[in-house]
Amino acid sequence: MLRAVTFDFWNTLFVDVHGRDREQRRAQLLADELAALDMTVTDAALEDALESGFAFFDRVWVNEQRTPPCEEILDAILAALGTTMPPEAHARLVERFELLVLDIPPEPVPGAPAVLDALAQRYRLAVISDTGYSPGRVLRTVLERNAMLAPFEYLYFSDEHGACKPDPRVFRHTLDELGVRAPEAAHVGDIQRTDVAGAQAAGMSAVHFIGANNHDAARSTGDLVVRHFEELPAALGGLPCAGC
């Protein structure tokens, strides 16, 4: 029978409804730090540089199967601007970027807190999340502030381990921590490449959650496709134990 369920973080547990506001604040923080160093840049240059940071992250994420930490993303942004920063200013800006998600937080997917509490009565739960600007230690705080930390027995954040989804080792490591076999577990996530294909490659069932991000819905290979979080208890209850 199904014994464990793992969850992605972004667009599965939380929706980044204020992502654009956070991006604008990030640009302002960068501009302020550069101004303090007597460097001025145009708004267009800032926007292009921040886009270069995202592009750098995506290249590393896809090609190296790791998620570069905030320090590396900032280096890519500064390189796009053709400049560098003294170590003290660099460290200060990294910290501000990392913590920005606490000042401008995402919102829980509707129904998620109550559903997680219910699922924790039946299954062992874990989070498996790739990280970007915000490291695992900060995302733990996001979970805690929304009363969503307690249901989880284990949390895997890519910045703390090096490897990221879809590497099957990420899923297997988490299941080892939970003490269950891959056929006894299902992963819930929104991205076909990382969540669905990654979990299935590790021998797990995959539940493709499209309630917050449905970009991959048409090409999903998920064992189940779920649009509303409240559907999960019944859907998981009817999911056969893969290979049991």
Language-model region placement:
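N-terminal helical cap/lid subdomain that shapes the substrate entry/recognition surface
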Residues: 1-114
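Asp-based, Mg2+/Mn2+-dependent phosphohydrolase catalytic module
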Residues: 1-5, 15-17, 36-44, 113, ...
